[in-house]
Curated annotation (Swiss-Prot):
This is FAD-dependent monooxygenase. Its cofactor is FAD. FAD-dependent monooxygenase; part of the gene cluster that mediates the biosynthesis of the tetrahydropyranyl antifungal agent lanomycin that acts as an inhibitor of CYP51 and blocks the ergosterol biosynthesis. Keywords: FAD, Flavoprotein, Glycoprotein, Monooxygenase, Oxidoreductase, Signal. It comes from Pyrenophora dematioidea (Helminthosporium dematioideum).
Amino acid sequence: MYDVIVVGAGWCGLAAAKTYLQTCPTARLLVVDGDSSIGGTWSKERLYPHLVAEAHYGLFEFSDLPMRREGILPDGRIPSAAVHAYLTEYATKFGLLPRIRLNTWIEDIRQDPTAIGDDKAPYWTLQVAGSSQPLQARKLIIATGLTSEPRMPSFPGREDFEGHVLHSKMMGRADTGKLLNDPSIRHVVVYGGSKSAFDAVYLLLRAGKTVDWVIREGGGGPSIMTPLNILGQPSFRLNNSRVMSLFSPNPFEVAGERSWWQRVMHQRAGTFAQLLVVWFWRVLAYLLQRPWKYDYSVNGKQLKPILGLDSVLWSPATLGVMTHPTLWEDIHSGERVTIRRQNITALGQNKHVVLSNGDRITADMVVCATGWHARHSLFTPDEQLAVGLPSTSSFDPKSQAHWLNLQKAADEEILEEFPLLQNCPIALPPVRCEDDHHLYRFVAPSSGPLAQERLIAYVGFLRTTGAPIVYEAQSLWATAYLTGALHVPALEEREKEVARTNAWIRRRYICGRKVPFALFDFLPYVDMLYRDLGVNSRRKKNAVSE
């Protein structure tokens, strides 16, 4: 019986395990991961040639271990191997390696109320794939994040397709490497418009392949790709500054204690203040998009953000850093890559890929850069609801009515508090309350027996661009929560807060309607976590430095 099991050995899991052990050094703690090496997204089996981190050197590290300069590219880009080496060094420095069990894929997690340990406390049972011996723990930290379960489209005719079909997650596998070097694999279709699609296209072109890049019509469009540098600084540094959150209406400050800026620019925003905020984001969008010259070619036009200069403000698609700017030369030349805004409707014989306009493409391989599942198969659908996760299952009628009422009230409150959010150009679709993450502070279940007994916490379940900064704060909050050292408000207040933050995300970020998202607001979120803990998160000597 373990005191704590951490599921996931990437950035989130390592931060969570280290933080918990520093607080409780005698705890029996185990970290499990299904891969054969640590790193999560940056594990060895998920690395492939030319894969580079979006963050610049110095902006992708934990606060207690600087990243070594060895292996860093001259312009400050961080190759994937350097990220993996850094995480290995981190796990070594803090004594985590002996506590990590790799090649351990968790199939199912259950918390049986009748299962009581020797200390009369309930415990979790984790079923390991290929093993008849389950793992048991008193408490859990789920640190798999939001990019662990690939979303694979279900293509009609897949069984008749003679080519290869794989998710972009598999690009680093040895068998995928063999396909890249196979001269019989000449033509590849890449499906999707995310940052991983840009990376896949670049890799395939460097491997000598011809690419048809198909981006789904009717979705959020291609990712908004930022240049490596903006105004002489790494673009990631700008996004990691408080300047961005100044112009982004967010709910993370204490009600009644908001800064004069938040009150004037967002809460009481008149026409002039709203115009100022909108034009800040439009100027930024112009600076981000100008280097790519979208209108220069037919291909380039297919990659234009769907909301133009308003795309950064409302984020219909995720933001990415163009880690390989020379890809634009290939895009504009159109010699070996063709970009299409269509849906793939079917696969078929003779290696045919059928598009929604009736066109047929012959392809030896299809790479699906189609993102990740928001639901987590570690738990059954009913258990997903109990632990605060989205689910295809439904609440009982009473709970459903309760959450729908909270949802409606929270949406009205957010729109009244932040008038700018009433102007989102894409209407909010109907929302099931079961599709939300019901996690207080995006870390702990908001309600139910599990919340009362503090048996489970999450790290990495809010998508941001400030990964290490956020994971450290979440890990400390989760540790304090699980050990009973953190005061949390009463049930009613927690549930209102969860409904409120979910409503804000849906209104603030169009792409946040799929997963929890705080692109430009993660520093106020981190401030909030540390405020809960009684820690001052503003430690620089003046407001300008902050």
